[in-house]
Amino acid sequence: MKIKKIVLEKWIDPALISHYLTKKFGDKGLAWLDSDGKENGEWSIIGIKPKKIIQSRDINNLDKTNNPFNNLRNIEKGFWIGWLSYEAGVYIEPKNPWKKSNMATLWIASYDPIIKCNLIKKEIIIEGTN
């Protein structure tokens, strides 16, 4: 996979970027990993219009196709943004009493390109394969 990077000349606050992209494309699939701009929070990353979404749900059905850890092992290379819930622990500790939940145990989406905002250097990088 050949990755291309474009560094924008002008700084734009990630909140404004996210707001603009939401107005233009809608918020379905929008992912914004925000940071505080301190030493350990240098980057905010934004993805819009995912190419692919993978979810794992139903902690009462512990089959292999629903296992979030199997789904993570099988993803292709790319720019993925998402989360793994605390309840995914049911696949590691199935005998513990887990509460039923409608929330996904895994939600990840593939984006191409992504927008990386360096909050310390005030630099915006668009990174992708096309």
Residue ranges of each PLM-predicted region?
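Signature of the chorismate-utilizing enzyme
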Residues: M1-N130
